Amino acid sequence: MLRTVGARVRDMPRRRAVLLGVIGSVLLALCSHSVGATRNRGGVLQELGWSNLGFGHLYGIVVVFMWVAILLMILSWIVVGGRIVRLGEALGARTLIAWVAPLFFAGPLMSRDIYSYLMQGTLARDGFNAYDVGASANPGRMFFEVSGDWRNTTTPYGPLHLWIGEGITRITGDNITAGIIVYKILSLASFAVLAWAVAGLARQLGSSPHLAVWIGVANPLAVIHFIGGMHNEVTMMALVCAGLLLGLRAAPVRGLVYGSALIGAGVALKATALFALPFLVWVFVARRAGTLPGEDAPRRRLREILRDLRQFTPARLVTMLIGGLGSAAVMLASVVVITWASGQTWGWVAEISGNTKVINPLSLASLLAGFLVRPLSLVNEEIYFNEIVAVLRPVTMALMLLGLVVCWLIWRRGPRDAMVGATAAYAVTCVLNAVVLPWYYMAPLALFGVWVRDRRAVIVVAWLSMVMSMTFDGGGNNRLYSLWWLIVVGVVMWWTATTCLRDSADGHRLGTTHDLPGEVPVESVDRTPRQ
């Protein structure tokens, strides 16, 4: 029976698969106004007189419809992805638009962060320093929509974030609905730029742009959290990926300058954009001083790493120093200009560490603390979860910094290698950072598809994306502590991923349909162009 069902899912006509995604997206948009991150005062249901859909038995029924909607979106995505991976079909702009467009009409989903964004914008607009005071310093209509945990918390974001929020709230005033609509437009525009940049990176590196956009941008995790949740990571990654694309496409020096400036703008939005800058330097080094011998591949043996370290020629060393200092200077200049133009202070630097209130097992420190608290409390009743986390977080943060350096040292042979390294670096932050949320994974996911060649890796990443899409409910509460939920979702999603993506006929590689001619010009020291 499973084989019959699997064959029907795998061979589903593309038009039907896309239609299921559209139905799921429309249904999710409708459900968001009942079971999403709804407003405490006002909102669509109150305006329509349907407030009874926001509580009681009807609320429970809408929750079921919300999960059905997400499952339809996941099924549509994986079936279309199977046709891209196995048959080399194109993703197509119309398919992407069909999946995303209905969510323009959705309310905030899976997080209340958008209300904090608007509140922080009003702080900047009304002359408050959001790095010194929280939402409670400027009470008003928006204050009541901010999550209680964050009403006295300063913002961890950069001056560009506050500048955007200030501009939006100057236009919309204290109208929450209008502010959300403008943020939704910004999210959609950033999403489009991200898709364009990821497709361009894939072409430059000889990969399939359709696979890259499908796995890195169009996946349900991104669509739900970037468009439904309107998180500023979508704008940050649009700037980062556009910067990396310019670093590959423009002449080496200009590419480094333009790319560093855009990544600097990303840093002014959220500091984690900085992790991509060292790998832009490796792109510059490879294009100016030549690539190192060997295959640009994610897996690297220890002896290969040691051999690469010994092959640090004077030309590469000089190019690296010039490129590193130059990129850092341009990036810093970009941040300085944005900080000055926005009228913000440098207080955001002290807030980079962000908050530590969020506890979930996506962060290794929180996961280990959850396992250790019971046995340790048997030894000493005075040992609590918070004490264990306080000890583990500095350790994992130190390991994260070490991991970032290791990624930079290992993946440096050429442009594709640099993208592998950037992906690995962002993945390290998603595991070892003190606080991790599902949309943080969109940074490594956005870059993953531009270099991947192994079908097994695509299956695993697709599976993780689908599972992660099912871990947060509409209001932002997580299901990561519901073991039965994770087991059932994990098993079903693994069966779905392997059914749609696996093709035993051609082994583990993605096939010739994904091997495109690379377009990255690599110049040696004597300016001899090579590929």
Residue ranges and their predicted role:
Residues 203-209, 298-321, 405-422, 454-458, ...:
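Membrane-interface helix-loop-helix junctions at transmembrane boundaries of multi-pass membrane enzymes
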Residues 276-330:
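Perimembrane helix-loop-helix junctions
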Residues 1-27, 47-105, 414, 419, ...:
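Start-transfer (signal-anchor) and selected internal transmembrane alpha helices
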